[in-house]
Amino acid sequence: MREEAIKVTNLRKSYNGKAVVDNLSLSVKTGMVFGLLGANGAGKSTTIECILGTKQADSGEVSVLGYHAKKDRRKLFQEVGVQFQEGDYQPEIKVFELCEEIECLYKNPADWRQLCERFGIGDKLKNAVKSLSGGERQRLFIVLALIPNPKLVFLDELTTGLDARARRTVWKILEDLKKQGLTVFMTSHFMDEVEALCDEICILKKGEPVFY
């Protein structure tokens, strides 16, 4: 039986008395691609933030790779990759400079040059991040999430802004990484993407799981 990479029990988070995540429980096994789905405002991003410990949940328990997300954040940081839609980067920073900055944070980083080649942005290393197209920037953010050489990666709206061909290229790379043992926790709006990649899904509506 595979170990649990993520275990969430009765997670609850509210703002001004309104529940954004309401009594959510889920389990993600090691080596699995898990999809968290829902409309904007359903509680997907807040769920990820509570799992990572960057937001304090009101109640509930969370275990990530056997760690307590808040107490063991430094250890967890070395084993988890996170990709979000946009980052707060210096305006003129170049792709290679940003990759080098991220690389320095980790003990056993992956080869970011190889990752950039694999994701089709190997010829953009000297370009300013802000000069990249939306699709190129999206692929860069996935590369940044993989630089830690993580056991678990969180991918938020994985292929937003990519054309059909680029999306399928990303899917293939993730399938290869999954075969190597990577666990993926992703959010997506695309049902074809979910069908192609996910082993299990949870659908949120107003913070509550309506399908799991």
Please name every model-derived segment:
Residues 1-12:
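ABC-family P-loop ATPase nucleotide-binding domain
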Residues 13-186, 191-205, 211:
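ABC transporter nucleotide-binding domains
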